[in-house]
Amino acid sequence: MTNSSGRRRPDVTTVEIIGGPEALEIGLSDYDARWAETYLRHRRRILDALGADVDVEHIGSTSVPGLAAKPIVDIVVAVADITSEEDYLDALLAAGYELRVREPGHRLVRTPGRDVHVHVYERGAAAVHEYLLFRDHLRADADDRALYENVKRALFEQPWNDMNDYSDAKSDVILAIKSRAGAARR
C-alpha cells in the first residue's frame, strides 16, 4: 500500500551516521584506470543483488579519467522507493556492503574496506541528476577538471578530523562548476 506520494511510508527525518565521525586517513591518488574496473565489478554485484529495475552509475572523481581522487569508488543507485528499504537494503547488506548513512532521501552503504561507497536515492532525485551533470562536465571540460583537482590538492594540505568536513570544504568550487555545467547544457 502506498501513500499519496507513491511511497509505502514516510522517509526518515534525521541523519543517522552509523559508527560516528571518521577521520580522513587517505590522500589523493593520481587517476587509476582500475577504478573503472572496480566500478564494473560492483555494478554487477549490485545488479545481481537488486535485479535490473535499478539504475547504477559511476560517479565522483574516480569516474573522471585524468582526475586525481581519493581511492574510493563512488556509485549511485536509483531505486523506485527510498522508503522501502526492504526492497534494497537487506540485499545490499547480504551482498557484502555495510550501512553507513541513513538520511532523508539518501542511504549510503560501503564495503568493509571503505574503498567503495554506494549512494542510494529514489529514481528522479535531484541529487542523482546533479552527480551526473557534474561528472559529465568534468569529463568534458579540462579547465574545470584542473580547477577541481587543484582545490582538492590544496585542501589535502590540511588535516581533517572528519571526511564530511573535507567534502563540505569543496562545496563552493563544486557549486561554481555545476553552475557552469548547467549553463553549458542549456
Curated annotation (Swiss-Prot):
It comes from the Bacteria. InterPro entries: GrpB/CoaE (IPR007344), NT_sf (IPR043519). Pfam families: GrpB (PF04229). Belongs to the UPF0157 (GrpB) family. This is UPF0157 protein SCO7215.
